[in-house]
Every structure is written in structure tokens, then in C-alpha cells.
């Protein structure tokens, strides 16, 4: 999926996160994480984010994740929503989506 415009999804409530995405100027994936549980789960959050981007076919994005203790499924859902909004797609092909392990 091509990121066409900045977009975000989520809240700053406990057990949630805000994910913001925007097009990358140098065609790379950049993930910046701010989290209340970064020391314990930072590597796992980054892994979930990279896997979600791979499953969505995103090869170029700048992503900011502001996490307040969200579960992996919440993080993935917020990433999916932000990417879909940024890609300006109105319908998602769930039949071809690869679920995370």
C-alpha cells in the first residue's frame, strides 16, 4: 500500500495507543516509539509494527507510536486503521490479508 497523506488512529487512553503515519521522503520504514512500557515491551511493539506493515504491503512510511500499554492486537488494529486512512482506501480486502502469528 502506498502512503499518500498523513493519518492517525487511536487514543491516549490506558491500554490503547495512537499511531500516526506519513509518507517517507527517502522510501524507508521509520518507526518511532514512545511507550509507558518501552523497557519491558519496546522490542515486541516494534516487532508487531514491522509485521503489520509487512502484511499490509507497506515499504515506505514514517510511523509514530505513542503507546499506553496496548495489547498487540490493539497496536496492530491501530496500525491497520492509520495505514488504510493514509492510503485513502475505502474497502479493505480481508481475504488477502495475512494475520499475524
UniProtKB/Swiss-Prot annotation:
Check the record and name the Pfam families matching this protein.
Answer: ACP (PF06857)
Q: GO cellular-component terms in the record?
A: cytoplasm
Q: Which InterPro entries match?
A: CitD, Mal_deCO2ase/Cit_lyase_ACP
Q: What is its main location?
A: cytoplasm
The UniProt keywords, alphabetically, are: Cytoplasm, Phosphoprotein
Give the subcellular location: Cytoplasm
- Give residue numbers for the modification (O-(phosphoribosyl dephospho-coenzyme A)serine): 14
Highest taxon, organism lineage: Bacteria
In the record, the note on similarity to other proteins reads:
Belongs to the CitD family.
Question: What does the subunit comment say?
Answer: Oligomer with a subunit composition of (alpha,beta,gamma)6.
Q: What does this protein do?
A: Covalent carrier of the coenzyme of citrate lyase.
By what name is this protein known?
A: Citrate lyase acyl carrier protein
